[in-house]
Amino acid sequence: KIKQRVNELHEFNPMLGFRGCRLGIVHGEISEMQARAVFEAAAEVQNGGTKVNPEVMIPLVGFKREFDLQVEIVHRVAQEVQAAKKVKLNYLVGTMIEVPRGALTADEIAETAEFFSFGTNDLTQTALGMSRDDSGSFLPHYAELEIVKRNPFATIDQNSVGKLMQIAI
């Protein structure tokens, strides 16, 4: 059964494939399990006398509805854990902007998101269509030919990723 599940989840392009919030939407039990782990740990620590403020970050959001569906799971699980552990947790739910569509529609996502973070590695890969892992085979040549002035994985390319970040802000 495990081998069958592994084969079902095999991806042809893991960078753009079945991961992040997409995986959590299709298999909500994964998001539920992760949220439960966060809130149970937070409840245990807080019931031990230390104030905590967990921040749950939903990855790879490109559509507001993706985010909203995941937020519903997070809030439901938070309520269940707080009731079971008799604790009140102050928590935030936000997203990491990692795909161009997420940056371009950040105003919509912000209607629900309580915070944003930028995943500049993934955002660079998706904006430029370059794999960081493969870039060593061509980036030195690109620099030599002055196609790129700097390694876009070492510094933010202001003409692409930088502009996407400005739009999102």
Which positions does each model-derived feature cover?
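Conserved alpha/beta-domain cores
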Residues: 1-169
